[in-house]
Amino acid sequence: MFDYQQPDARGHFGIYGGSFVAETLSHALDELNAAYERYRHDPEFIAEFRNELAHFVGRPSPVYHAARMSREVGGAQIYLKREDLNHTGAHKINNTIGQALLARRMGKPRVIAETGAGQHGVATATICARYGMECVVYMGSEDVKRQSPNVYRMNLLGARVVPVESGSKTLKDALNEAMRDWVTNVENTFYIIGTVAGPHPYPAMVRDFQRVIGDECLVQMPALAGRQPDAVVACVGGGSNAMGIFYPYIPHEGVRLIGVEAAGEGMESGKHSASLQRGSPGVLHGNRTYVLQDANGQITETHSVSAGLDYPGVGPEHAYLKDIGRAEYVGITDAEALQAFHYLCRAEGIIPALESSHAVAYAMKLAKTMRPDQHVLVNLSGRGDKDIGTVADLSGADFYCRPSCRGQSVKGGDPSVVEIQRKAGGVQ
């Protein structure tokens, strides 16, 4: 078994991680770290967290043998860890519950979050509604446009969504604005970071809340397939779904861990988000990791068809796993991800998120190189309802999200109903 004890007491994964923040946030991070270290071993906290996962989220999520897909692709058997079946439609809810429980115990009534694909924003808004907490979500204006269904979900759940117009108007910029908010309102505000990035203790804390994914797989795979998988595949943007399934498997040296980054329009095009393959060590959002940057250390523009992978950095633990050779990282282009999206819809009746489609696409490639008695486990991190508008646009489909898109009135569009919606916050 591979001996793995990371991070160290200061939040370092080898040379990565740590805490590079303004002095105004140092106290808040120390306070958060102390609270996490206290409650992570507290039986009452653990019991409440597990109860919420079981009865609010619907865990454990199943592992599903994609038999038709395996047969048609050829080679190894492909299994899907169905995080798309969680309440809110992705893995993000696992982490938001853990952090919201911490926020309540720390007496922080206001919660902020950043979001790219919108799934972390929806998960945060959901748990804030459940616990009666104020919720503000920062989202790049480009992502607001391409993930509009999730923006409306957040509004329905009572969150205030703040479009970010600076920079590339995507996840990186949303995270910047959330950090600025936290500095200003640190006394009453808890920042729920959605991925395994940010300053210590966030990378380890988010990983620990997400490890339930891999812990379940350790039990489910032997029951379903007779043994552990030969390879575990997950998409990597910031990397929380990947760390969630990778972490429990790190000691199992016979299991390959493969992270799939967004190769966008191709690695040589410059239009991608593959920080582990094309980046270099640098500091971003409070931690040292692999970053896409120019010769002067300026963050470069990224691209992915998937909003959740459109990020110029990655969690520091992924950087460490790459350097020590325990995990490997590959790229999948927009075109390959879209092809896998459509294939999984038709072959298995599952509509995956575009983020997850990157992992599915690589798993299909990998399976072909393996024997039929081998197994590939894919973390299907989220469902694709949020992406159907984007996919329709890219495929040229005649898709309309609602009758009003065609200039038609909506059935039941009575003025009194609209006024009720307006008062409820549904119409701005």
UniProtKB/Swiss-Prot annotation:
Record PTM N6-(pyridoxal phosphate)lysine, positions in chain: K92
Taxonomic source organism: Leptothrix cholodnii (strain ATCC 51168 / LMG 8142 / SP-6)
Record-listed E.C. numbers: 4.2.1.20
Pathway assigned in UniProt: Amino-acid biosynthesis; L-tryptophan biosynthesis; L-tryptophan from chorismate: step 5/5
Single GO MF descriptor: tryptophan synthase activity
PANTHER family in alphabetical order: TRYPTOPHAN SYNTHASE, TRYPTOPHAN SYNTHASE-RELATED
Entry-linked Pfam families: PALP
Protein family (similarity comment): Belongs to the TrpB family.
Function: The beta subunit is responsible for the synthesis of L-tryptophan from indole and L-serine.
Gene Ontology CC annotations of this record: cytoplasm
Entry-linked NCBIfam families: trpB
Protein name: Tryptophan synthase beta chain
